[in-house]
């Protein structure tokens, strides 16, 4: 069948792409001398802009944060409950400003002309080490009075949370009305997290959600184009009364929340202005400017915005802000992957183990598809039973392909066989496979989630390749249950396919391979039962419908 040939070709192409990516990863381009000089200048500029002062360390049960005392920037954020991708002996570091990469959260107050009112003036804190002992820990950074304004920046960390409240306390002693705005930014370079590959690649970059534009990704490449052209043409909403924005990467995110779920928007004094760009220092910035109500002489005011910097745990982020769960990158199949993960999550809540939840989900999906797949498998079983007659036709007509095809079509008609009926089971599984792939790949809930024995992380490949080998065995078993192709070349290809798919699945998440193994076992049981039933009917001389 042409479909089988196409499937085999597709599978081999996938393996070639995976193998090439693994053995010959795309090298990073070596900059030309002029480009290298420009890069060094840009790096020097970036280091000057982010020059560290005395660090302030904050430790809670979930994070260890490092705040730059002078600028008040959040320079480093370690997620203590998550292991590093490449080294399970170390915790995962989200923010950092070292030699490896730059990824920080910044905030400042601007005057009516858009200038930082504390430029060149540093904050100070009463101590350098803070540890969570109760429900919250507060870090107050105070700046000397400037132009009659007394400003404090206050970080509040909460127990068992990745939500950080960043607040400015302002006392206006200038003798005149102060018209200010607060600017909140996420700044990072374009480096990708460790573990990104051809089939394990997730979006990295700025995102924004607004009621006007819904969820939008703003790619680094679009921002590069804007920087080269000097225009601002990247597609995103620039003025909004509410929403959120920031940066995402595989499993993790950092976003400024303009309106907490069920709360008031910080844009109450006027629309917030969003600016996503590549800066002159080659760093990328996702920022929002929040206008403040006029502060009268002698009055005090405060403005606070929540920063969520942590894992993309659906049950958590969905309760922080409207549609924040859209930051979980399901690619272009969100419409299918999201409900699949919802069902998987419900099963996990009942069973308590993500691996067994995948097994039960597979059984449910198989049961839902049963009415459709059953007819197709019966067609395949009838094709298998008619194989001797097909071989007779082939021997009778030899090289006369036209007569051979006519005789085969007449046989299909007499035996009530649909020669394309066997394609349907695989076609039906393709959207499920793709949706479940993204549901498992994108969901941080499965990161470090064990199943049993050697499977200690369902989001990563089987370390000993046991599941892919089992999957190959089940695929070999299926080839003997299905009707043999009449074309010798196709027959050889169908025997090679199990090996091809098993190699491909070496690099897939163990949770996905588990789904495929269970699905194959159920398919084998179903096909075996149907084959036995049809063979029994033929042996008894009954008409097979």
UniProtKB/Swiss-Prot annotation:
Keywords annotated in UniProt: Cell inner membrane, Cell membrane, Chaperone, Membrane, Protein transport, Transmembrane, Transmembrane helix, Transport
Annotated membrane topology: Multi-pass membrane protein
Main location: membrane
Annotated compartments: Cell inner membrane
HAMAP family from the UniProt entry: YidC_type1 (MF_01810)
Family statement: Belongs to the OXA1/ALB3/YidC family. Type 1 subfamily.
Protein name: Membrane protein insertase YidC
């Amino acid at each position: 069948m042409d479909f089988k040939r196409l499937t085999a070709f597709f599978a081999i192409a996938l393996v070639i792409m995976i193998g090439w990516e693994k053995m010959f990863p795309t090298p990073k381009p070596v900059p030309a001398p002029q480009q290298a000089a420009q890069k060094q200048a840009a790096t020097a500029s970036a280091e000057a802009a982010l020059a560290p002062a005395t660090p302030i360390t904050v430790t809670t049960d979930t994070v260890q944060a490092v705040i730059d005392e002078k600028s008040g920037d959040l320079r480093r954020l370690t997620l203590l409950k998550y292991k590093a991708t490449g080294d399970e002996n170390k915790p995962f570091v989200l923010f950092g400003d070292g030699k490896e990469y730059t990824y920080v959260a910044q905030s400042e107050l601007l005057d009516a002309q858009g200038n930082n009112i504390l430029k060149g003036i540093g904050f100070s804190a009463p101590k350098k080490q803070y540890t969570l002992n109760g429900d919250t820990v507060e870090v107050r950074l105070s700046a000397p009075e400037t132009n009659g304004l007394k400003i404090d920046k206050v970080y509040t960390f909460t127990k068992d949370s990745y939500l950080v409240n960043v607040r400015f306390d302002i006392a206006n002693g200038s003798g005149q009305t102060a018209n200010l705005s607060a600017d909140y930014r996420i700044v990072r370079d374009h480096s990708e997290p460790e573990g990104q590959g051809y089939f394990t690649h997730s979006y990295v970059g700025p995102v924004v959600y607004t009621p006007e534009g819904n969820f939008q990704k703003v790619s680094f490449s679009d921002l590069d184009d804007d920087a080269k052209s000097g225009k601002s043409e990247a597609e995103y909403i620039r003025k909004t009364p509410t929403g959120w924005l920031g940066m995402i990467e595989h499993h993790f995110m950092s976003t400024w929340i303009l309106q907490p779920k069920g709360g008031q928007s910080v844009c109450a004094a006027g629309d917030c202005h969003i600016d996503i760009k590549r800066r002159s220092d080659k760093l990328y910035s996702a920022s929002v400017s929040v206008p403040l109500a006029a502060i009268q002489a002698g009055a005090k005011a405060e403005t606070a915005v929540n920063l969520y910097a942590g894992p993309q745990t659906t049950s958590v982020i969905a309760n922080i802000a409207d549609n924040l769960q859209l930051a979980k990158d399901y690619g272009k199949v969100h419409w299918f992957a999201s409900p699949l993960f919802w069902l998987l999550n419900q099963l996990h809540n009942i069973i308590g183990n993500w691996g067994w939840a995948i097994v039960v989900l597979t059984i449910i999906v198989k049961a839902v598809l049963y009415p459709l797949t059953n007819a197709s498998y019966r067609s395949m079983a009838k094709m298998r039973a008619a194989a001797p007659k097909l071989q007779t036709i082939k021997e009778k007509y030899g090289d006369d392909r036209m007569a051979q095809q006519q005789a085969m079509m007449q046989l299909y008609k007499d035996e009530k066989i649909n020669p394309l009926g066997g394609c349907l089971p695989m076609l039906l599984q393709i959207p499920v496979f793709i949706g479940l792939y993204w549901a498992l790949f994108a969901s941080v809930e499965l990161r470090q989630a064990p199943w049993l024995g050697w499977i200690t992380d369902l989001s990563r490949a089987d370390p000993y390749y046991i599941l892919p080998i089992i999957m190959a065995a089940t695929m070999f078993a299926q080839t003997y249950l299905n009707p043999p192709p009449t074309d010798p070349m196709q027959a050889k290809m169908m025997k090679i396919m199990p090996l091809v798919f098993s190699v491909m699945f070496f690099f897939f998440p163990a949770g996905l391979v588990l789904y495929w193994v269970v699905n194959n076992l159920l398919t084998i049981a179903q096909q075996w039962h149907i084959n036995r039933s049809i063979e029994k009917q033929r042996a008894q001389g009954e008409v097979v419908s």
